[in-house]
Each structure stands twice: as C-alpha cells, then as structure tokens.
C-alpha cells in the first residue's frame, strides 16, 4: 500500500506546479501509488499542471515487452512513462530532474542519476516548430499541452503538404533480431500513436473507423525468410498482444505467413494533422 504521507506530499507538489510536475517512482508494482495520486479527494479539481509520472516496473503483472511504455491520461491531465525491466538498464532514459519521488528509500540506488529539484518553472515560453506534418503538429500539440506558445512554420502554403498529405498510412511496431534501439523506439511510438488517436477521438476531432482504426496488421514474409523470422520472434518472446506468427492462410487467403500485429492499424495522415492543430487551441500560431 502506498504511504498516505508520501501521496499527499507528491500531490501537493503537483497542485502547486505551474507547468509540468515530474515524479519518479522506482517501484511501480501494480500501480497503487500512481492510482492513489490520481484518485483526488472529493471536491478537489484536476490540477492545471501536467503530471509526468516516470516509473520502473521489473515484473509487470500483465505481459509487456521490455523497454519504455507510454500512457496518456488527458482526463487526469497526466502521463505515465513506464520502464519495464531492471531500472539500472534504463538510466540513460530515466536520468533527469524530478519535482518529487515516490518510495524515497528505494530511489536511493538511482540518486547518482536523478536530481530531486523542481524542474523548469511554467512561465510562458515561446517555441518555433518547423514543419506542419504529422511530426511537427504532434510536437506542437505536446508543447501546447504544457502551456507553451508555439509558432508553426512550413514551406508549403498549408499543413500536411508533403508525405503527411497521403490518403492513408499504416502503423505497427518494428521487429528486428536483437531488439535494436530502433525497434524499442518504434514500440514506444506505436503505443503513443494509438493513444494520441484515441485522445483526439474522445475530443471529437477524429472518428475511429473513418479517420483511423486498429483492425490488425499482417506483415507477410517471403518463404526463404520465414524460418529466420520465426526464430527471431521466439528469441524475443514478445507477448501475443504485441506480435505473433501467422501461418499461411491463417488470417488471409495467402500462401505467405508473416508477423501479425493485432493492434496494427491505419490512419488518414492529413486528418490527423488537422486534429492535432485544432487541439492546440489558442497557444498555436501558424
């Protein structure tokens, strides 16, 4: 059970933060401390500051691939950055400045890499973003959500004029032998993409099934590469919720087997860009 005094102290730091409150939790476990922090007392409004909760979970209760995972909770004005695996293997990703720490005793092993001091104050700042495609509009939205004024520039007359103007695009994680940094980054990006699209849909800016969807994605593999690909998949030991091997004809009338991503999907890039820019609100200048 989380310590009530610690939860109260961390919640106070969140309530008094002006822009972003960053919290480190070295022992996420089942997420009790995180849930307790979000479970505000009756009558207490959601804090205006964004809560960025960075946590380590060596033994997740549900199957999760190792590495960094991201969960956006706009209804709580919070983000969860969860590292699955031994925390010391992720020090490069976890090091930084934190406004508060859960489980201070357990966090001492990270004290060399963590600076427990308030992060940058939330004074109004202005940032220029170059490019008005998926990447640029997503960066702009992330900055605006932190209360930062954004000036968006693009060489074209309007947004989504380049590759982001394609009619449709597919998205799924990238799998490689040895689980390269690119693969780990793609998993994080994939999770972030799905959550970003879901958040925009909840705001009424996108419609699932019309602007995007996640019906699953089958990446076929040539017969001469099938055995090696299956061996790679077995070595990585990812949960089937992320990826599994599909035999020829199992999912589609094809003679090729392949990698099946059950949450893989498609999106209309231009609609995604438009939704991002609309969600930025008054903090965006184009």
Residue map of PLM features:
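Conserved Rossmann-like nucleotide-cofactor binding loop
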Residues: 61, 135, 158
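N-terminal Rossmann-like FAD-binding beta1-loop-alpha1 element of flavoenzymes
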Residues: 126-152
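Glycine-rich FAD pyrophosphate-binding loop
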Residues: 145-165
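Helical element adjacent to the flavin cofactor pocket in flavoenzyme catalytic cores
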Residues: 259-286
């Amino acid at each position: 059970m989380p310590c009530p005094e610690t939860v109260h102290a961390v919640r106070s730091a969140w309530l008094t933060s002006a822009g972003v409150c960053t919290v480190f939790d070295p022992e996420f476990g089942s997420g009790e401390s995180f849930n307790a922090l979000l479970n505000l007392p009756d009558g207490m409004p959601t804090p205006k500051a964004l809560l960025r909760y960075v946590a380590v979970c060596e033994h997740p209760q549900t199957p999760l691939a190792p590495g960094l995972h991201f969960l956006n909770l706009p209804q709580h004005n919070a983000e969860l950055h969860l590292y699955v695996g031994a925390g010391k293997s992720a020090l490069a990703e976890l090091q930084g400045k934190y406004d508060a720490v859960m489980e201070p005793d357990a966090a001492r092993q990270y004290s060399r890499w963590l600076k427990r001091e308030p992060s940058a104050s939330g004074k109004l700042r202005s940032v220029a973003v170059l490019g008005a495609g998926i990447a640029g509009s997503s960066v702009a939205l992330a900055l605006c959500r932190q209360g930062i004024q954004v000036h968006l520039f693009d060489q074209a007359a309007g947004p989504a004029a380049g590759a982001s103007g394609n009619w449709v695009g597919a998205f799924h994680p990238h799998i490689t032998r040895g689980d390269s940094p690119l693969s780990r980054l793609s998993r994080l990006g994939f999770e972030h993409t799905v959550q970003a699209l879901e958040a925009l849909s909840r705001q009424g800016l996108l419609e699932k099934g019309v602007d995007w969807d996640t019906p699953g994605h089958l990446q076929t593999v040539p017969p001469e590469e099938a055995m090696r690909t299956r061996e790679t998949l077995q070595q990585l030991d990812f949960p089937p919720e992320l990826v599994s091997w599909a035999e020829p004809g199992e999912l589609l009338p094809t003679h090729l087997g392949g990698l099946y991503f059950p949450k893989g999907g498609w999106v209309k890039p231009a609609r995604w860009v438009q939704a991002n820019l609309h969600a930025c609100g008054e903090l965006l200048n184009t």
